[in-house]
Curated annotation (Swiss-Prot):
A motif (Gly-cisPro motif, important for rejection of L-amino acids) lies at residues 143-144. It catalyses: glycyl-tRNA(Ala) + H2O = tRNA(Ala) + glycine + H(+); a D-aminoacyl-tRNA + H2O = a tRNA + a D-alpha-amino acid + H(+). The lineage of its organism: Bacteria, Pseudomonadati, Thermodesulfobacteriota, Desulfovibrionia, Desulfovibrionales. Its main location: cytoplasm. GO terms for molecular function: D-tyrosyl-tRNA(Tyr) deacylase activity; Gly-tRNA(Ala) deacylase activity; Ser(Gly)-tRNA(Ala) hydrolase activity; tRNA binding. A Gly-cisPro motif from one monomer fits into the active site of the other monomer to allow specific chiral rejection of L-amino acids. GO terms for biological process: D-amino acid catabolic process. This is D-aminoacyl-tRNA deacylase. It comes from Maridesulfovibrio salexigens (strain ATCC 14822 / DSM 2638 / NCIMB 8403 / VKM B-1763). It is found in: Cytoplasm. Homodimer.
């Protein structure tokens, strides 16, 4: 599992011209699942570690301008969007290969579980995109601050 976490002052996701998810200040999270991920991933220590990191990362500024506050501290929102392209390989040619991405059904199941588990721990609103849909994602990368978490780094 790969998570790209971006601090945002707000954002939204549209599908077919309709807003399906919208947040205020918080984090925008692109979540992708790879072939190495299995249906047992949500039961692993790594799963909970990544969720806790996502919510607990101190990437919001305190009164002194230092990144000392977490999403919990600011009661920030989360916008979760599935993104299989995080597993793109560009080693050959100019067209990315996505053979490293998890099968669509498994990825959908894992994304649904991620939404459920993040929602239980989130300090405020959790909004999502629509799995497998062509989406327009609009948000302000505040800072910018972008952090990448990869499950293989926590095994």
């Amino acid at each position: 599992m790969k998570l790209v976490i971006q601090r945002t002052s707000g954002g939204k996701v549209e599908v077919e011209g309709k807003t399906v998810g919208e947040i205020g200040p918080g984090i925008m999270v692109l979540a992708g699942f790879g072939k190495e991920d299995t249906e047992q991933l949500p039961e692993s220590k790594v799963w909970n570690t990544l969720i806790d990191k996502m919510i607990g990362l101190r990437i919001f500024e305190d009164e002194e301008g230092r990144m000392n506050r977490s999403l919990e501290d600011i009661k920030g929102d989360i916008l979760l969007v599935s993104q299989f392209t995080l597993y793109a390989s560009c080693k050959k040619g100019r067209r990315p290969s996505f053979t490293g991405a998890a099968a669509p059904q498994l990825a959908s199941d894992l994304f649904d579980r991620l939404i459920a588990d993040v929602s239980q721990k989130a300090p405020a609103k959790v909004a999502t995109g629509q799995f497998g849909a062509m989406m327009n994602v609009d948000f302000v990368n505040w800072g910018p601050v972008t952090i990448i978490l990869d499950s293989k780094d926590f095994v």
